[in-house]
UniProtKB/Swiss-Prot annotation:
Native source organism of the sequence: Mannheimia succiniciproducens (strain KCTC 0769BP / MBEL55E)
Catalytic reactions on record: orotidine 5'-phosphate + H(+) = UMP + CO2
Binding residue positions for substrate: 10, 32, 59-68, 119, 180, 189, 209-210
Gene name as annotated: pyrF
EC number: 4.1.1.23
An annotated Gene Ontology molecular function: orotidine-5'-phosphate decarboxylase activity
EC top class named in words: lyase
Lineage: Bacteria, Pseudomonadati, Pseudomonadota, Gammaproteobacteria, Pasteurellales
Any one GO cellular component localisation term in the record: cytosol
Protein name: Orotidine 5'-phosphate decarboxylase
Function: Catalyzes the decarboxylation of orotidine 5'-monophosphate (OMP) to uridine 5'-monophosphate (UMP).
Catalytic residues as annotated in Swiss-Prot or TrEMBL: 61
Length: 234
């Protein structure tokens, strides 16, 4: 069983999402629910996915005052999600409080990760918001801060994986969007890589959306991706 693939559900309706979900095997992937779907469909949709035996990554990228983020993370834990994220740019105290509030959940706590630099952002984008650093420099800075706060990992582009492993060690989880099988379009992700290359670079989990969700045969594409990385994770 492969647990490396996280399928990003980016649909406008529950019906469309479930049509995809009911075609794929929960033993071959996990599912990511982002802002659009969660805002539209709420916790009931997450429960529908869990009822189908899928682990859910609740990708809401919390970013607010520490108390508010901590309470939101606790709500995610109560929902039983597998993974939840927040913005590292919210600061050390925000991340520490979010991690602390999960202590009573023990082994049932969700994996808590941070978003460092969005994969759509380049040097100019950072400069325009007052950050005079390259995406790589900012990723490293915020990843170190996340580890210091006790978080379990970070979201990062595949090209950043190798250097983050050097800085943060083998146990810190690296979750990588910007994954495109050979032949796929890049879309709005600027820093991309194929699944085998990402695994070889050291990624723990690969977030893949449209190459699977917009495929004529999503189940076959998912099986093909898993087959392409099977010998790398055995």
């Amino acid at each position: 069983m492969s647990n490396k693939i996280i399928v990003a559900l980016d649909y406008e309706t529950e019906k469309e999402a479930l049509q995809l979900v009911d075609q794929i095997d929960p033993s071959l992937c996990r599912l990511k629910v982002g802002k659009e779907m969660f805002t539209t469909l709420g916790t009931n949709f997450v429960k529908l996915l869990q009822d189908r035996d899928f682990d859910v990554f609740l990708d809401l990228k919390f970013h607010d005052i520490p108390n508010t983020v901590a309470r939101a993370v606790r709500s995610a834990a109560d929902l039983g999600v597998w993974m939840v994220d927040l913005h590292a740019s919210g600061g050390l105290r925000m991340m520490e409080e979010a991690k602390k509030i999960l202590e009573p959940y023990g082994k049932d706590a969700p994996i808590l990760i941070s978003v460092t630099v969005l994969t759509s952002m380049e040097d100019l984008d950072l400069l325009q918001i007052g950050i005079n650093a390259s995406p790589m420099e900012q990723v490293i800075r915020l990843a170190h801060l996340s580890q210091r706060a006790g978080l379990d990992g970070v979201v990062c582009s595949p090209q950043e994986v190798e250097i983050l492993r050097q800085h943060l060690g083998k146990e810190f989880k690296l979750i990588t969007p910007g994954i495109r099988p050979v032949g796929s379009e890049f879309g709005d992700q600027r820093r991309v890589m194929t699944p085998p290359a990402a695994i070889e670079a050291g990624s723990d989990y690969l977030v893949i959306g449209r190459p699977i969700t917009q495929a004529a045969n999503p189940a076959e594409v998912l099986r093909s991706i898993n087959a392409s990385i099977a010998n790398l994770i055995a």
